[in-house]
């Protein structure tokens, strides 16, 4: 019994230091919250947030729970009300998507979904539909975090499969340039990432995105341009709690 207790204690200690070491290497951690000013079709509209909520267990594996929120303010609400909430659960080691819930409200448009990706069975379950898959999948919102774990080198390209609702699309991700960006949070030297596929867009029926990541240890998404249902959302970093 004493031996079993020692083994159990050792497992706990090793697990603790493993998670600690992993967290030390990452440019973000649980509790990080990035706040953005948001413009819709270049009109000041409201605010958006990216939050690392927790580390949960999904499909018997540890996963980062991250959340994207966007909302218009009182004036913009009268013109085109936006209340978008997307929760994604990303693999703790490689940041591909395990699970996602979406609750989208943009004007009169409404959309909700729950997606569970079962890699062991090579399927994705979206609401009540089952979709065959191959390899690792990334949802568009996971890219805000996945790219932060990589060396962002100008001219570098990467291929991956993007999962959005029931759509699976192969995309080439391109780090196009270095740019200096002025946002409410300050001035940042950034690497610019443009996911694309010729003739296709990153988000089905919505549009493309461009992300400016700070060229420092944190690689924060300083500026984001998203094509949403009926226009363009421009997000600029306002405050950050790392």
State where each predicted segment sits.
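Sec-dependent N-terminal signal peptides
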Residues: 4-16
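Hydrophobic, well-structured mid-protein blocks that either form specific transmembrane helices
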Residues: 106-150
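Acidic, serine/threonine-rich low-complexity disordered tracts
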Residues: 22-117, 152-242
């Amino acid at each position: 019994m004493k031996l079993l207790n020692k083994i159990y204690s050792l497992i706990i200690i090793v697990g603790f230091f493993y998670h600690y070491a992993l967290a030390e290497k990452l440019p973000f951690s649980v509790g990080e919250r990035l706040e953005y000013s948001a413009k819709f079709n270049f009109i000041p509209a409201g605010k958006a947030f990216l939050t690392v909520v927790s580390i949960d267990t999904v499909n018997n594996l540890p996963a980062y729970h991250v959340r994207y929120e966007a909302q218009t303010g009182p004036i913009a609400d009268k013109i085109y009300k936006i209340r978008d909430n997307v929760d994604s659960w990303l693999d703790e080691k490689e940041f591909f998507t395990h699970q996602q819930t979406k609750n989208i409200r943009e004007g009169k448009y409404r959309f909700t979904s729950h997606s569970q990706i079962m890699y062991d069975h090579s399927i994705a379950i979206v609401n009540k539909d089952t979709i065959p898959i191959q390899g690792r999948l990334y949802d568009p919102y996971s890219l805000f975090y996945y790219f932060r774990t990589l060396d962002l080198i100008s001219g570098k390209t990467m291929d991956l499969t993007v999962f959005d609702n029931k759509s699976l699309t192969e995309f080439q991700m391109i780090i196009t340039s270095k740019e200096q960006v002025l946002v409410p949070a300050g001035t940042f030297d950034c690497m610019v990432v443009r996911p694309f596929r010729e003739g296709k867009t990153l988000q089905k029926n919505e549009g493309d995105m461009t992300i400016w990541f700070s060229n420092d240890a944190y690689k924060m998404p300083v500026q984001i341009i998203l094509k949403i249902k009926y226009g363009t959302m421009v997000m600029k970093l306002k405050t950050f709690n790392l």
